[in-house]
């Protein structure tokens, strides 16, 4: 987490790495399932507030292109896709295979977005 000043207020900027299948949508791979609109809307809001979003998925090729296009149709954009943010690479002088993030949101772990949404209201 990094703190930045906006309008004389200290704001914490977080990097969130988000899985696609089973997280942003119902897992129907290789198809795309129904959207998790509660999470998607929260991520759109958080990005508007300055948080950085990374799509972190096993999808590749056309499946990845389709997933990104699907997200964009719902208004969700990412700062990086299956890669570290440029400023992280610059800071550490390395592009690690492990994505650097403050929070990893994935259906194969505890569902952290539920706690995140409860904090927001």
Q: Model-found features: residue ranges?
A:
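HAD-like aspartate-dependent phosphatase fold
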Residues: 1-121
């Amino acid at each position: 987490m990094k703190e930045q000043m906006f309008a004389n207020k200290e704001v914490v900027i977080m990097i969130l790495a988000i899985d696609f299948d089973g997280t942003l949508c119902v897992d129907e791979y290789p198809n795309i399932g129904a959207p998790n609109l509660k999470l998607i809307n929260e991520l759109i809001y958080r990005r508007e507030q300055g948080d950085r979003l990374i799509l972190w998925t096993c999808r590749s090729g056309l499946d990845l292109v389709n997933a990104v296009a699907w997200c964009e149709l719902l208004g969700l954009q990412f700062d990086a896709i299956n890669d570290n943010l440029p400023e992280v690479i610059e800071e550490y002088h390395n592009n690690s295979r492990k994505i650097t993030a403050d929070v990893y949101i994935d259906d194969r772990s505890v569902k952290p977005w539920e706690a995140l949404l409860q904090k927001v209201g």
